[in-house]
Amino acid sequence: MAGANRVSDFSIHVAKENLKFSAAHFIAYPGFREPLHGHNYQVAIKVEGRLSTTGYVLDFGLVKKLTREIVERLDERTIIPAQSDCLTIHEIDSQVTVAYEGDRFVLPASGVALLPISHSSAEELARFIWTELHRELLHRNSLENVSAMEISVAEGPGQMAIYRQELFPG
């Protein structure tokens, strides 16, 4: 039988127009900071695994719904990496202040996505979205047949980062 020794024989791919977000960001590390700029990010998901008794690896509708909820939290925000080793970040009242060397940004808190990442790169955004989606699926006991998940985050046409992790279902 083809694939008899493999955990995953099927995969689903979700790449819908509404799985996008527009956000500002800048990359900063010691000795370097990009100018603040933005992207129209596009997110896609690949899920690998076995078929359930209902004929699904994972329901497309659930993947779309949960991913959409995640990207909505990032849409029209300035992404700030809360775990940065070179940014000083303060949240006071309704403002977020971000400082790097001599530069200082004061932003309305409602317009900031303060994320548990070190850099606001497409790579770390892909891992962040993967982690959030995995947490939501785990909470719903929806990972029984899933052996791997992959998230891609495109900053523009032909330019994307991918984060993939194996899950090894029971």
Model-derived segments and spans:
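Charge-rich, low-complexity N-terminal segments
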Residues: 2-170
